[in-house]
């Protein structure tokens, strides 16, 4: 798209508005060298978006939705800089039709998410949470034995890890898991032939000690783990989800954990974020064999620094006409 480098297209400095700065966790996006006006808001309600972006050429967003009606009300907008890999909050077709560029950041959190997955593998198999609690609540100091049998402990080496999804993060998890002595397999799509290098969907469910989800949320994958597919899993198996919350029917997972069929879960994402009071994800968090983290797998210092720098580069390059 043609635009004047560093200007609003009328010779004036570009107006850049960050609508949800709080999603950067205090990390600063580098500002461009080109003349500009920079405005920041920690959080923006849907009803505030149009007013705050009035006259802006650049919008910086993470979770703020930008639909066609919103874009129609912003004739000056030229760039939406998304501080994430996914751009599902933007109606990309509507943006393209209006000549608005959408630039995101791909691959910044691959190491961070993969390490979070491996952390969950260790924490669940080694009983990290219940063992810590046995010290804090006085069971160790008040007992007669030299140790506390607070939870079952399983060696990770020799377990099968089933991965659903085969992108960069899944491959990074696979490499780390193999280094720990795990048998790593990739699942094919549900109801389809497995394909080269993969096992059938149902076979991975039935034979894996741990499964980890690394696929996008689509109509096909929504609630891919439900009462029926959970019943196919190996008794006592563990489930990890650092991808999208709605990949799992959490009510069905809760029932499977309650029955003992599923041995544990590590979950970093929820269908609605932040979760609503009393929601299934918060009920699960109270269980001793479940670890819930608040969508934190991506936010290592190195990952967020890279995200901030590359978002700044996206803006600077756009203003420079690149």
Residue ranges and their predicted role:
Residues 56, 74, 207-208:
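An anion/phosphate-binding loop that grips the pyrophosphate of nucleotide cofactors and donors
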Residues 98, 106-160:
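Phosphate-binding beta-alpha-beta segment of Rossmann-like dinucleotide-binding domains, i.e.
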Residues 65-77, 220-239:
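Rossmann-fold NAD(P) dinucleotide-binding segment
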Residues 236, 242-322:
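Rossmann-like dinucleotide-binding domain for NAD(H)/NADP(H)
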Residues 11-12, 147-235:
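Rossmann-like dinucleotide/phosphate-binding beta-alpha-beta segment
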Residues 42, 62, 83-84, 100-111, ...:
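Short beta->alpha connector loops at strand-helix junctions that form conserved
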Residues 51-52, 70-73, 203-204, 229, ...:
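Structural alpha-helical scaffold elements that stabilize or flank donor/cofactor-binding regions
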Residues 1-56, 185:
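N-terminal glycine-/charge-rich "phosphate-binding" loop or analogous flexible N-terminal tail
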